[in-house]
Regions:
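Structural signal for alpha-helical transmembrane segments and their membrane-water exit/capping regions
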Residues: 2-4, 12-44, 66-77, 198, ...
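Structural signature of hydrophobic alpha-helical transmembrane segments
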Residues: 1-6, 57-65, 115-118, 180-183, ...
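Long, contiguous bundles of hydrophobic transmembrane helices that form the permeation core
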Residues: 6-9, 31, 38, 176, ...
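Transmembrane alpha-helix interface/packing and boundary motifs in multi-pass membrane proteins
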Residues: 13-21, 70, 104-113, 144-151, ...
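Alpha-helical transmembrane segments of multi-pass membrane proteins
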Residues: 94-107, 132-152, 174-177, 183, ...
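Membrane-core helix-loop-helix motifs of multi-pass transport proteins
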Residues: 127-214, 221-225, 365-366, 375, ...
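Hydrophobic alpha-helical transmembrane segments
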Residues: 3-8, 26-29, 60, 95-102, ...
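Membrane-embedded alpha-helical segments and adjacent helix-loop junctions characteristic
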Residues: 42-130, 271-358
Length: 431
């Protein structure tokens, strides 16, 4: 009963959002609440919602200060020189621009933090996309796939870290076998970018494209950027922030809070101007925070009501007796839908240990289950429980339903390619 209700809840949510019957905010809250009432758990709704909010509150606060920090950096034109270098290198060719988006997305995803990655990529490329009329959903799709592939696979990215800790694995033993499939999947993303770039180039008016190329060649396309001491300070502060973030010197929230305060004092001295900056950037941050908190309601109800566990058990029951050798492959495929709908905590701490225990009965090492589980991160980055996704959607000014209509076909394709690469390289096995 709970499994059926859980799948029905997820299907209803997708239908309501993609058909635009409800906004993402209302759908992500109302569907699990209705399901909990139907399941007879209405009396426990308050506790389930609070448990869910407890898990996402730190993330919501982190996103607030990350948006404030990078919003300030954008107003200070920190990334403008990078944009100009990219534009000159691309020579105004949409194919090169879109492929460059994929390459930069893959590189910045190495820092492991989705919000940071999205804001850097959007800062560099979104002005170019808007100038040429390239669909910003192309940027969002590539950035999400890159983050899921790199940050979702690396031991320091957060998702795999959960699997390594809960299954008591060696990070080296887990990761060394994932480097090959991760690299091949990155190439697959670049191939998708090339195809999307060709498609976007065919949509752009030839005269408009030719005029833009002339502007680039003459230098008219660029605004002069004054590289004063504040520009160099901002660059050094941002670089230091990235280093401390990767080194895990302190919690991300603490790092962004301190960095924002320092940047605010250096770049804007007048108290009134500081307050105006916070008001402007808060307008971008607050909608993101609201959606993250709503996702916490979704996660709390789905997890504490037992629907997630029932769905996982139902999926496991599909594997016939004697087919234990295919559990790693089954885990990789199951990771795609579960990763899409579930929070990383719920998936890695709730589902993966059950799969690993089942695999152990057939002599399959837990490392393979962790690797298989990480493959679902590409679709996780496109799902409603991915907090950084709401930042990305805010930056490109897109609705969740529109994004998923565009992105899911490519996300599913690349995810299955990831499964195939993992099998070919021996990261997971079926023998």
């Amino acid at each position: 009963m709970l499994a059926v209700l859980g799948f029905a809840t997820l299907g209803s949510f997708m239908l309501l959002v993609m058909r635009k019957y409800l906004s993402a905010f209302t759908a992500i809250m109302l569907t699990p609440i209705a399901a909990a009432v139907i399941a007879g758990k209405g009396a426990k709704l308050g506790d389930m919602i609070m448990n869910g909010l407890d898990t996402v509150a730190p993330t919501a606060a982190l996103l607030l200060f990350a948006v404030l920090y990078f919003g300030l950096m954008m107003e200070c034109k920190l990334f403008e020189p990078i944009v100009q270098v990219i534009v000159r290198a691309s020579k105004g060719d949409p194919v090169r621009i879109v492929v460059g988006t994929a390459v930069l997305s893959l590189l910045v995803a190495l820092d492991g933090d989705g919000t940071t990655s999205y804001m850097i990529v959007c800062s560099a490329f979104l002005p170019i996309y808007r100038r040429l009329g390239i669909n910003p959903l192309v940027l969002a799709t590539l950035a999400a796939m890159a983050l899921g592939t790199i940050s979702g696979t690396t031991p320091w990215g957060g998702a795999a870290t959960r699997g390594i800790s809960v299954l008591h694995l060696s990070a080296t033993e887990y990761f060394v076998h994932m480097i090959g499939p991760m690299a091949l999947t990155s190439l697959a993303i670049i191939a998708v970018a090339y195809w999307l770039g060709l498609r976007e180039r065919s949509k752009i008016d030839a005269e408009k494209l030719a005029a833009y190329k002339l502007e680039i060649a003459s230098g008219e396309a660029f605004e002069p950027v004054k590289a004063d001491w504040r520009m160099w300070f901002n660059a050094a502060l941002t670089l230091l922030l990235m280093v401390l973030l990767i080194a895990e010197v302190a919690d991300l929230l603490v790092l962004f809070m301190v960095a924002f305060v320092i940047a605010l004092l250096v770049n804007i001295r007048a108290i009134g101007d500081q307050q105006d900056l916070i008001k402007r950037q808060a307008a971008n941050a607050v909608p993101v925070m609201i959606l993250v908190l709503a996702a916490g309601v979704f996660t709390g109800i789905m997890t504490d009501s037992g629907m997630i566990e029932a769905m996982a058990d139902a999926a496991l029951s599909i594997v016939p007796e004697g087919w234990g050798n295919v559990i790693p492959l089954f885990t990789a495929i199951l990771a795609l839908p579960l990763g899409f709908f579930m929070s990383n905590d719920g998936y890695w701490f709730g589902v993966v240990p059950v799969l690993a225990e089942s695999a152990a009965h057939y002599g399959i090492p837990a490392n393979e289950i962790a690797r298989a589980g990480a493959i679902g991160q590409i679709l996780h980055m496109m799902g409603p429980t991915s907090a950084p996704l709401w930042v990305l959607l805010g930056l490109v000014k897109a609705e969740l339903g529109d994004f998923q209509k565009h992105a899911l076909r490519w996300g599913v394709l690349v995810s299955f390619a990831y499964v195939a690469f993992a099998l070919l390289t021996g990261a997971i096995s079926i023998t």
